[in-house]
Amino acid sequence: LFLTPFNSSTLPSGSLNSMAIVNDSGQPIYGVSTYAVFHDLKLHANGLLTYFDAWDRMWYAMDSNYVIVDSFWCGNGYFADMHDIQLLPNGHALLLACDTVRGVDIRQWIGNAPQQSNVIGVVVQEIDRNKNVIFNWRSLDSGGYKVSDMIEDPYGYLEADIDEIHANSLQLDADGNIILSARHLDEVTKLDRN
């Protein structure tokens, strides 16, 4: 079982955060506590473990001895997002990032929205072994904003940023294209990598 805290903001000031691996009896196999904020500790098919470090805004990969052997970050001025990383068989990595457009008038979709809102989209990147971006897709490049669950505003976010897409995961499909899960769209989107 791979464990990382999800919401460290509820911890008292000065608290340590942890990530751990425990066996099916609950006995710790690996653990570390630090002031850093960790997310999404997981094992990949190539045997590497990855986790997201929220302070560094990047992913780290560890070998079977829990030694950091690589790190992954987004290019083109974006910061990696904590929601997912996929390590591909060719040594490349798929990463998510957020992309904000400020000062957008979204009142045609949400009548009571502020005249100037910030719309948060998602960026999907594939980086090669040398950390070069070889694929870059922006949800906000579609030319218009999609109707999403955020438009219903169930949480009263109209005074804050509008998180149009909120991507949670990505995966390669059998055709080699990217499958993106978008929570606020209630959809799974297939992205052509060609």
Regions found by a protein language model. Name each.
Residues 1-194:
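Histidine-/acidic-rich catalytic cores in large beta-rich domains
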